[in-house]
Amino acid sequence: MLRFRKVAPSLKNGGNLKLFSTSSTLKKIASSQPLRAKQVSTSESVKYPVIDHTYDAIVVGAGGAGLRATFGLAEAGFNTACITKLFPTRSHTVAAQGGINAALGNMTKDDWRWHFYDTVKGSDWLGDQDAIHYMTKEAPKAVLELEHFGVPFSRTKEGKIYQRAFGGQSLEYGKGGQAYRCAAVADRTGHSILHTLYGQSLKHNTNFFIEYFAMDLIMEGGECRGVIAMNLEDGSIHRFRAHKTILATGGYGRAYFSCTSAHTCTGDGNAMVSRAGLPLQDLEFVQFHPTGIYGAGCLITEGCRGEGGYLLNSKGERFMERYAPTAKDLASRDVVSRAMTVEIREGRGVGPEKDHCYLQLSHLPAEILKERLPGISETAAIFAGVDVTKEPIPVLPTVHYNMGGIPTRFTGEVLTIDENGKDKIVPGLYAAGEAACVSVHGGNRLGANSLLDIVVFGRACALHIKDTLEPNTPHKPLAADAGLDSLKFLDQIRTSQGPKHTSEIRLDMQKTMQRDVSVFRMEETLQEGVKNIARVDGTYKDIGIRDRGLIWNTDLVEALELRNLLTCAVQTANAALNRKESRGAHAREDYPERDDKNWIKHTLTWQHKTGDPVTLKYRAVTRTTMDENEVKPVPPFKRVY
């Protein structure tokens, strides 16, 4: 039998479990681990030291959304903890290259209402227009705030923030030509934003728990009371009690074989929500970025095309002129990815196997490449062996972003539905960033709206908590056995002796998703996909962990991450099979048209634990804005670029 024991910290620390709250900034940076737990000698056969922590608010994840929420809360006087499974500046936000959208009007006249229009159109009318209204209106303020925090934006000759062209962006509600709306730090925008936000978090009284793996939410009576996490350094278990919990854990790109995501993008927050009996939303909408390096999957930013690069087929033809006569290579990502796939299918691909396309940059002046795309020149040389001043880059559509995730309001509050199908807020639980589905991206995200999303909605979570909670509000006691199921599962999986290795099951899952739930989808392949991913999901019980230790057990962590990926993958395949239309990134060859009469609605999916069947329901898309006196809703029309 497993029982929780509170473990007393060393008396040298004065018995204070929240050591980081009194640590100097230097110690916060130097230490990745604020607590040292000692194993309790008990009669149980399995011994896990368990430590309880109490905070006003906790944030899981230290990417852009998590850090913006964290220091927003700390700045407002809340005792705040940030739990992250890796060092904050290794979070995947660091990989965002192109920029962040905001209607600053530094290059041409611009208006946030035009940005609103482009985002609704880009979402293929699956985006909630109240949330899009909020995001696009807040965008200029968010970017100027980042500038004040210290983000070193590239500059025009006049000293203004430099803005480049990006796909799907227009002026005057689509009638005024290409917009230059994407504020950039060369081609390393995410890197700069992440480091700046981390610096701001250290500046405020933030308590970091670095290299702690969040396993599950602690739920009581439908309310989120915190999370249970494992310290990867020593295997100790930590229960974090808080009035408010924010999940900012990123996407689940690693469910696919070829993706631009870091190996840490495993849908942890999504799966935690699913295991808590709550729904995930719109998982069928998986964005394929048009330009991942062929064979490596590394991202080549859309900024390349924004600076004047273009795609070529084997005939040397700029084929996007046929698919998007106006926007050409700067059409939305789903349009470009499908066009590339069609070119390859019809035999106009390049290379010995005619299975990819070329991105041409060599016509651009060398000084432009050096100043505005320095990282791309380096990436292409390392991963494709290409000198971009002389040769094209071999590229292929690659899984890049999850439009779906944890359903939330624009305040960050997590939603479910009641027995009558009406929206219901989950008390104490918030989500932001790629883990969340607000939904501002709907069926397809516009490039450079993701960095905007994380900053705006990370901040929105902090603002809503500030408005609804007083710092140092007393806590209700936590049930003595809270999190016990998580600990039982951890013990079960750590000691599992099945015949299958984590990597074997993971590869099976990735190949299945890449083959059956890809750029183009059909009933037959999706049925196969649902059947195959259910089979893979069923093999998880056969997993075997070779390392029985608790200290830096990467085998165990990968097994836990695989469970999370499977939860996301199974629901993605089921949601895709059930949506009988083509919308945004969900392209059905057997249902090639968008069906606004039946399918302007969000998919909700439930799967309580690995191996369980998936339940599907639907909820309405918000088709009104926050204030029609500010901006009118955009009614659906045929989406062309």
From Swiss-Prot:
Protein name as it appears in the record: Probable succinate dehydrogenase [ubiquinone] flavoprotein subunit, mitochondrial
GO terms for MF: electron transfer activity; flavin adenine dinucleotide binding; succinate dehydrogenase (quinone) activity
Transmembrane stretches, start-end: none
Keyword terms: Electron transport, FAD, Flavoprotein, Membrane, Mitochondrion, Mitochondrion inner membrane, Oxidoreductase, Transit peptide, Transport, Tricarboxylic acid cycle
EC class (word): oxidoreductase
Residues reported to bind substrate: 289, 301, 400, 445
Source species: Schizosaccharomyces pombe (strain 972 / ATCC 24843) (Fission yeast)
Protein's membrane topology: Peripheral membrane protein
Compartments reported by the entry: Mitochondrion inner membrane
Binding site for FAD: 61-66, 84-99, 268, 434, 450-451
Protein task: Flavoprotein (FP) subunit of succinate dehydrogenase (SDH) that is involved in complex II of the mitochondrial electron transport chain and is responsible for transferring electrons from succinate to ubiquinone (coenzyme Q).
Gene3D superfamilies assigned: FAD/NAD(P)-binding domain, Fumarate reductase/succinate dehydrogenase flavoprotein-like, C-terminal domain, succinate dehydrogenase protein domain, Succinate dehydrogenase/fumarate reductase flavoprotein, catalytic domain
Reactions mediated catalytically: a quinone + succinate = fumarate + a quinol
UniProt main location, coarse: mitochondrion
UniProt family annotation: Belongs to the FAD-dependent oxidoreductase 2 family. FRD/SDH subfamily.
Keyword flag Zinc: no
Biological process terms in GO annotation: mitochondrial electron transport, succinate to ubiquinone; tricarboxylic acid cycle
Entry-annotated residues carrying Tele-8alpha-FAD histidine: 92
Residue numbers annotated as active site: 333 (proton acceptor)
Names of required cofactors: FAD
PROSITE patterns the UniProt entry points to: FRD_SDH_FAD_BINDING
Assembly: Component of complex II composed of four subunits: a flavoprotein (FP), an iron-sulfur protein (IP), and a cytochrome b composed of a large and a small subunit.
Single GO cellular component term: respiratory chain complex II (succinate dehydrogenase)
